[in-house]
Amino acid sequence: MDFIRAIILGVIEGITEWLPISSTGHLIIADEFIRLNQSAAFKEMFDVVIQLGAILSVVVLYFHKLNPFNKLNPADKQKTPREIQLTWRLWLKVLIAALPAAIIGLPLNDWLDKHFYHFVPVAFMLIIYGVAFIVIERRWVPNHEFSVMNIDRLPYRAALYIGLFQVLSLLPGTSRSGATIVGALLVGVSREVAAEFTFFLGIPVMFGASFIKILHFFKNGNSLSFEQFGVLLVACIVAFGVSMVAIKFLTDYVKKHDFTFFGKYRIVLGIILLIYAMFRAFLG
């Protein structure tokens, strides 16, 4: 039965990790109805592994763009010295943007999860950022031209600014992609570049967070049975495959549409969560 639950949760992670609708919010809902019959430590490891599956999809999809080493590229896809230089610059921008989350997130992440990983805080963050998306798209964007239409032209200062917005995503329900896309739009980055940079920014942030949590899991004397390993592997593969589709969908979607739909979706989901939380509290 856990294998079926793992597949469902992998699908949810694969879709919601990259769309700006909060993977945490959806996983909280899923956990209410699709609980894994496992320990709390394993569930935390499970969340880490499905995130790894999601981020590996970015590495695979954008390997050539992100790879500065020609030795790892096919003969027909060798980069010019200029392209290699731009790739290194892109990585520098990604690392600059990742710094605020690393500095602030490491000491606060567990505390924030403990105090805010609940229905009501998540619901409010869903609604707040849903409203933000709608306001930015309807009020801000029409009065400001996009100044960054190519990721190679993204200024280092803008990368840092986007990274500061990513810190806000430490609050469950915010959405890492949602926070960074909002920050990118406010500094004049086009929707396409905002989405793409968000994908890349997830690599050091999510790999780093996953490494720390995996280390913490085994350091505390936990181990995995053969069945548990199988559950993790299945969920990781599903999250990887679904993420590939979700990333392709979002990159195509933002070429013709804005983020208003996602804002409305977040608001509706947030309201549903609040109603459910009140209903559950009423029933005791």
Swiss-Prot record:
InterPro entries: UppP. One of its GO terms (molecular function) is undecaprenyl-diphosphatase activity. Its EC number is 3.6.1.27. Pfam families: BacA. GO terms for biological process: cell wall organization; peptidoglycan biosynthetic process; regulation of cell shape; response to antibiotic. It is an enzyme of class 3 (hydrolase). GO terms for cellular component: plasma membrane. Its main location: membrane. It catalyses: di-trans,octa-cis-undecaprenyl diphosphate + H2O = di-trans,octa-cis-undecaprenyl phosphate + phosphate + H(+). Keywords: Antibiotic resistance, Cell membrane, Cell shape, Cell wall biogenesis/degradation, Hydrolase, Membrane, Peptidoglycan synthesis, Transmembrane, Transmembrane helix. It is a multi-pass membrane protein. It is found in: Cell membrane. The chain crosses the membrane at residues 7-27, 44-64, 90-110, 116-136, 167-187, 197-217, 229-249, 259-279. PANTHER family: UNDECAPRENYL-DIPHOSPHATASE (PTHR30622:SF3). Catalyzes the dephosphorylation of undecaprenyl diphosphate (UPP). Confers resistance to bacitracin. Belongs to the UppP family. Bacitracin is thought to be involved in the inhibition of peptidoglycan synthesis by sequestering undecaprenyl diphosphate, thereby reducing the pool of lipid carrier available. This is Undecaprenyl-diphosphatase. The lineage of its organism: Bacteria, Bacillati, Bacillota, Bacilli, Lactobacillales.
